[in-house]
Amino acid sequence: MGKIIGIDLGTTNSCVAVMEGGKPKVIENSEGARTTPSVVAYAEDGEILTGAPAKRQAVTNAKNTLFAVKRLIGRRFEEKEVQKDIDLMPYTICKADNSDAWVEVRGKKIAPPQVSAEVLRKMKKTAEDYLGEEVTEAVITVPAYFNDSQRQATKDAGRIAGLEVKRIINEPTAAALAFGMDKKPGDSKIAVYDLGGGTFDISIIEIADIDGEHQFEVLATNGDTFLGGEDFDQRLIDYIVTEFKKEQGVDLKKDVLALQRLKEAAEKAKIELSSGQQTEVNLPYITADASGPKHLAVKITRAKFESLVEDLVQRTIEPCRVALKDAGLKINDIDDVILVGGQSRMPKVQEKVKEFFGKEARRDVNPDEAVAVGAAIQGGVLQGEVKDVLLLDVTPLSLGIETLGGVMTKLIQKNTTVPTKASQVFSTADDNQSAVTIHVLQGEREMASGNKSLGQFNLSDIPPAPRGMPQIEVTFDIDANGILHVSAKDKATGKENKIKIQANSGLSEDEIQRMVQDAAAHAEEDKKAHELVDIRNQCDALVHSVKKSLTEYGDKISADEKEKIEQAMKDAEEALKGNDKDTIEARMQALATASQKLGEQMYAQSQGAEGGATDEAAGGGSTGGSKAADADVVDAEFTEVKDKK
């Protein structure tokens, strides 16, 4: 049985970890970094770049470089958050046939789970390279406040990447696992404040020691799935653009290339301001107009940056207040505060958290890696490698159905521990009604229209009866991944209809299968490209080596042999100009065969040289025949030196 890896699929960066010898280990990627940018680029030649290579070429390929796609996953095109992103992103966000928000790259529409799958494939490959075996199973984390569609879409992304998602767990819960695993026994209540690249979560978690077993129980969770580091970057970009327009009279918002350079610079400046009091954004030749090139140089102080994002930091406090209230706790009941997510490194954020909770946040948790570590621990629990750990997570939002008058009737309240099941009996609204439509909703608003629609299905063939008479039992069943299954049953006839909630948007099974096949085909292309590079390198090295040897030892072989080698070398060099792996391999073999005689001469020469050295060391105690051979060797060396002159 292979390892179950833990993946933190982040908005800005992703991370992968695995249990090894009972301890979680964060795995470095092929570039040697412990986190990988969640960036995917589609090159002109059809190649797909992921991670740091994709991020590096973003400036020159802005329209086809996708980042922060997690903010679109499982969302409808009409949602106001998506509409807000359309104006900010250099790439195109379009409406899919099912009304979901998709992206368009090089004239092709792509679903966000497909883009996330590329990042997951990179994480999978990172783990496989480290473990030396195939990986097919994973625990993937999502923001605690992700709704059902977003969780389902994340699971789909895993499938497209060739991973069986054994469990979807909430990011703050994963961070709590990472924090609480090696803590001394005893009960404690912790607040996990998770401010990442695109989402914010707060979870109140109780870690209890029950008969030697670590129990992690989520008491309440809250958050905002459209608030994170990307928004902080955007405030900085807007400020710089405004300043530049004041000075130079040029609006950089209309220049995609300039904006991409500015985005990188803003991110860097934001990070620098976490340790320094001032930084300068310096971008020469940012743009040009009739008067010539323009250079951008803007000084930003930490105080200025803090004033730009003050309301964003403040927005994280209300969910903290609500989560505490839902958990039935006071601020004094919290023993530890843990900060997770890169944006939580900002001093102003830490100051606000300290101000609200009345205590310093813990510094012994790595904000970038804790979530992946927790996911790996959960993988270990599922595999039986980690014992004595029980994780009790919750559903972040209430679930219910639409009833008469457009009201949402809740069957499962928010912060209910999952897995869970709830049933309620409903009836018909009209006389002789033969079918009912079950409209499934998620959210906290009283009216159905204010909540997220997860999907709907019909229960038909209800026997004619006066309104209010038929007994229709609706059952909601949430699995451990927080994904909902709904059934409706007519108690009189026993007729039942069930669905696993597939958002009335979402990807259909056929689409997922097609994307899985696309990804597999792409993996095969990658493998072939890799093999071509390997054989090309081998052939190149052989040509170089034979060329060098021919220069040194060419006079030791016949002119005929030399000509054969030179021809084989020319053929190999010609093959290297093309992309046919088999041709390169065949020409390389031909060159290896042709240069065999040359190799023999080199070997004989080196053996002879060694023999001479041995005789000399023996002080002349060798036979005359040996001496004759030695003389030959010295002669040959002498001739070679003379030739070079």
Swiss-Prot record:
Upregulating conditions: By stress conditions e.g. heat shock.
Gene Ontology molecular-function annotations: ATP binding; ATP-dependent protein folding chaperone; unfolded protein binding
Region (Disordered): 601-645
Pfam families the UniProt entry points to: HSP70 (PF00012)
Domain of life, per lineage: Bacteria
PROSITE patterns named among the record's database cross-references: HSP70_1, HSP70_2, HSP70_3
SUPFAM superfamilies on file: Actin-like ATPase domain, Heat shock protein 70kD (HSP70), C-terminal subdomain, Heat shock protein 70kD (HSP70), peptide-binding domain
Gene3D superfamilies with a match to the protein in the record: 1.20.1270.10, 3.30.420.40, Actin, Chain A, domain 4, Substrate Binding Domain Of DNAk, Chain A, domain 1
Modified residues (Phosphothreonine): 199
Annotated keywords: ATP-binding, Chaperone, Nucleotide-binding, Phosphoprotein, Stress response
Family under the similarity heading: Belongs to the heat shock protein 70 family.
HAMAP family hit by this protein: DnaK
Task of the protein: Acts as a chaperone.
UniProt name for this protein: Chaperone protein DnaK
Source species of the chain: Aromatoleum aromaticum (strain DSM 19018 / LMG 30748 / EbN1)
